[in-house]
């Protein structure tokens, strides 16, 4: 009570980040896009980067899987130009965090919340994979579950607005 914020004594900057809508743990700085289409383009870019990196990793595992049965040399010798630098494809968690930082902004600006399901699902799957291996990413999973409820609420709101309109108004909408 003694530290209640007022005009003379504003909230300390470290607590303001926690109570502002953009300062939700574990993603403290939300992105704000120029418009919903720009935000959606970024979300889908980050989503495809995650999927592409996972594809490269699985190809790398398949190529370098030891061949024990028929060959005396169980590790394949690939030419230098076919060598893959796997460190270039280890940024999935960063891309998933970028998706989560942008989801709220795009949800606020869009009238098509269903377009956010795929990026949200890809980020959720990545964090679940991380959590199954290392018990990390639980806060991120909880944040995405919370976002899913906001996404459902926005979808129901848009559906309610469309159902309350007459068909001629929907056609011009």
Q: What does each model-identified segment do?
A:
Residues 1-173:
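C-terminal effector modules of eukaryotic transcription factors
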């Amino acid at each position: 009570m003694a530290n209640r914020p007022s005009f003379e004594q504003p909230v300390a900057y470290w607590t303001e980040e926690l109570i502002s809508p953009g300062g939700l743990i574990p993603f403290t700085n939300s992105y704000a896009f120029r418009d919903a289409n720009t935000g959606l383009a970024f979300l889908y870019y980050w989503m495809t980067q995650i999927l592409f990196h996972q594809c490269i990793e699985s190809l790398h595992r398949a190529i370098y899987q030891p061949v024990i049965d028929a060959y005396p040399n169980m590790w394949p010798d690939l030419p230098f130009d076919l060598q893959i630098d796997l460190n270039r494809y280890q940024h999935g968690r960063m891309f998933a965090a970028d998706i989560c930082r942008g989801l709220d902004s795009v949800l606020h600006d869009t009238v098509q919340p269903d377009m956010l399901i795929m990026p949200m699902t890809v980020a959720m799957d990545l964090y679940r994979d991380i959590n199954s291996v290392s018990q990390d990413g639980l806060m991120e999973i909880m944040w995405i579950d919370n976002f899913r409820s906001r996404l459902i609420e926005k979808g129901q709101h848009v559906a309610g607005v469309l159902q309350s309109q007459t068909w001629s108004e929907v056609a011009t909408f």
